[in-house]
Amino acid sequence: MTISRRVLAAVIGALALTALAQAQVGKTAPLYNTALQKIKDGKQVVCSTVSSPDPDAYCAVANSAADCTWIEMQHSTMTYYQVGDMIKRCGRPKAIPFIRVPDALEGDIQKATDLGVLGIIVPTVDTVEKAQAAVKWAKFPPDGRRSQGGNRMWGENYRETVNANMAIVIMIETPIGVDAADKIAAVPGVDVIFAASTDLGNFSGHPYTGAARKGDTVYEAMVTRIHDATLKAGLRLGGPFAWKDRPGFTFFQGPGLAAFVDAGAPIVIQGGAAQGGGRRGNQKQ
């Protein structure tokens, strides 16, 4: 009987140590989400936009100079199956995959996180509850209510470490959201508040863009309120790539494949001409 008690005590002790070790893994493990690490360090982070389901195009963008990919599922017709195929075929590229989901719904965020992305971008956040939902469905208990799937893209300790590596980006795009900016920025688990330039103008009755928007005091006042609420809360501030030199902004939605092609095609063509032709892509010689 004494031996049984000793064995039972040893088993209980081992289980307790295992649980403690697993808990510590999530707290002390270095971030494999390199984009989130840069976010936390206050460095500039650029996410290149991906709007088409071509795996080769995705891999080209994901292995460029970008910190992360902004996989667009709000304003595109891509399916989760197509996005999953892209991510799977590209493995673990340099740029960390983020997805802009259509809404802060369990089904959308569950699918996105199960695909292996390490960033959830939620559009049109007007309320504290919607920001809380983004965190809730993106993170495992005790930080959220995400159901556990079988993803092992980021290692065997994925379940224990991913909460610390999951970036949450909240987009404020309407006057209602601006009015709630202080409360939204105070939601635990949020990393970035993104001032959505285009829709901020669209939903406020100031739909013009670019140079025409400069000097609009109403529009600029909304941007300033988002700016101040975000930095006051100790979070990082996001915006369009055109704002990369704007004070306080460190997270940006960058250009997509078309911009890379526009910028790179002349270099490739001129380089080929200078070398007298050479190989031409996948064309047979």
Segments (PLM) and residue ranges:
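Bacterial N-terminal signal peptides that target proteins for export
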Residues: 1-11
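Expand to "…catalyze enediolate/carbanion chemistry for C-C bond making/breaking, isomerization
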Residues: 12-15, 20-285
